[in-house]
């Protein structure tokens, strides 16, 4: 299949099926909300609805003692949650308790757990909801650092738009601080919450942390393919500028590149103009540049982690395949597509061979790679930095702008502005703890001291 090919009827049907399933999931959400009831509706007759909360220092045996005491009063459990944060335990149970046993159960819990230094609260309320609120969205906040002021401002913005924070937990302490917030947004319909998204985008630029928000649910965990731009995304350089340096025309080429990435010039025309500057260079220069490439910090970790999870990973670049192929082999990527420099008699001619990999071709390449691997577009992720990546990010299920030009940030689903590629993992809900556990098991774990 070439970049201009279109999906088959079976592929189109699969896409329609996915859309139907997504609609059904949305309808199911509303149906669940309609049938949500109180604890009093869910427990047997003669039982009082109670929310039992225990807090204090975490010690071995606390949980066992808690449930042993509840079991002696034949308590009916509806929901339980326990968490430990820096040595402090919080344990809560939503339960049905025989009315005549409420006082003795409370006294028994306090007597038993006071020896562990735990406090006990029992709230009896027939109007307690029997089911947890179902979060509609997930927000990831990334910064270096993230401060209380940042979270206060984010929380106030959410409150101003009627959104509620259901939970917060840390997902990263290196190389950035990352927090994941589960939210309930009033308008949870597809396409809803647009004013909130705009307000958060403005807040991001004002306070200097990255904020990404997407719908909660299975689709967030269903991603199976990731496609990276190369120059200034997967690697730290613009390859054509590295080549131009050997021709003594780096500044001239860099100026054209900058205008093209901002969307001020047609990419294909600008590419031809820049490649002309390379005419006459010895082909060995291409190999030298390939050896000099430096990956963006976090690139190896990101690709290694996603490959462990079964992702297909690859690159689509407006750069040159002769430089990218060695990198793709080293990183064990599943696909790579880029322009081909014409070389005649060991010299660059100043031309490229075949169709230019431009904005449209990048998006078509993503589609082709997805279809060839049996992966639907809503299961894809694309990461890029320039106007040339707009169509690719718009096509992907999740488009991530990485230290990007404004034109790309405006259309991306999420934007990150720290030069560390493993932020992509945090946006996908993968925690630093999970990454490093896997690295420890296979001997690849390392933390490089951060500067600045």
Model segments located where?
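Long, charged amphipathic helices and adjacent flexible linkers at domain junctions
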Residues: 124-130, 211, 215-224, 257-283, ...
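C-terminal cap/substrate-recognition subdomain and adjoining C-terminal extension
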Residues: 280-398, 402-452
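Conserved active-site and cofactor/substrate-binding residues in soluble primary-metabolism enzymes
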Residues: 57, 61, 100, 104, ...
